[in-house]
């Protein structure tokens, strides 16, 4: 029987002052929270692995928790160092158009991360929603980002993560044609290893994700996973109904209300 893998999705790690310049604070996990996450994984007898290593059979699927990071925020360098220190790996999805700009990783940092065993993959050339683009534009995002990362780092780019989790109907076909082997989406659930390579589900860490809930993700508690999938289905319906701009306005309003 194929193992089911918990694939985690991070964005930024807040600094010691609890700040994450240039990142959406809603998705910025505290340093203490991230360290607690790593301890929870180790305590469960699991190891941190990149999706790339799992696909290349350099990690044991049955004993791994996959870690992924979207956007290439500068704080990801510290996260990579923590992961490398415990012998783990992770995938970091970056947009070449912002590499080296304020609050983002630069190419030397990405080279150091790759040398330490991290997997540097594509988040598109720009952080644009694919469902608002033509097929030719999506193809350009896939091809240009892959080429830029490979040219700068000298390592293969085989996995894509669509910005904002928005996908185009033909993404799988376009990604395969561009030389990718898998897509890590924002769909919520567990990954049945070896299946759904063009729609690998992930669980997103938020600033507000409690450690107890994280531990249930690691243990793959059925009720917890079901509730997250139900919430995702509801939010996906809202996105379809409101459109990207309407959904983002609603989301910002809800977040302001929650913090007031």
Kindly give the residue locations of the regions a language model identified.
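Short active-site-adjacent structural elements
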Residues: 16-18, 168-170, 184, 191-195, ...
């Amino acid at each position: 029987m194929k193992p089911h893998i918990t694939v985690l999705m991070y964005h930024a790690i807040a600094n010691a002052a609890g700040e994450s310049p240039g990142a959406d604070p809603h998705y910025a996990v505290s340093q203490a929270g991230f360290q607690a996450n790593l301890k929870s994984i180790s305590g469960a007898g699991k190891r941190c692995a990149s999706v790339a290593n799992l696909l290349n059979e350099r990690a044991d699927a049955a004993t791994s928790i996959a870690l992924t990071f979207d956007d290439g925020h500068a704080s990801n360098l510290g996260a990579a160092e923590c992961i490398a220190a415990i012998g783990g790996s992770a995938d970091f999805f970056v947009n070449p158009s912002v590499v080296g700009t304020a609050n983002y990783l630069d190419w030397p940092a990405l080279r150091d991360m790759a040398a330490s065993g991290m997997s540097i993959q594509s988040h598109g050339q720009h952080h644009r929603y694919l469902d608002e683009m033509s097929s030719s534009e999506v193809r350009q995002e896939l091809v240009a980002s892959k080429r830029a990362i490979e040219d700068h780092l000298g390592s293969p780019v085989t996995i894509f993560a669509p910005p904002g989790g928005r996908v185009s109907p033909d993404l799988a076909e376009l990604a395969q044609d561009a030389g990718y082997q898998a897509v890590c989406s924002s769909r919520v659930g567990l990954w049945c290893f070896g299946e759904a390579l063009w729609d690998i589900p992930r669980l997103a860490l938020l600033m507000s994700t409690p450690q107890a809930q994280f531990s249930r993700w690691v243990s793959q508690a059925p009720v917890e996973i079901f509730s997250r999938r139900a919430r995702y289905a509801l939010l996906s319906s809202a996105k379809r109904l409101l459109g990207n701009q309407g959904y983002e306005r609603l989301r910002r309003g809800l977040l302001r209300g929650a913090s007031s």
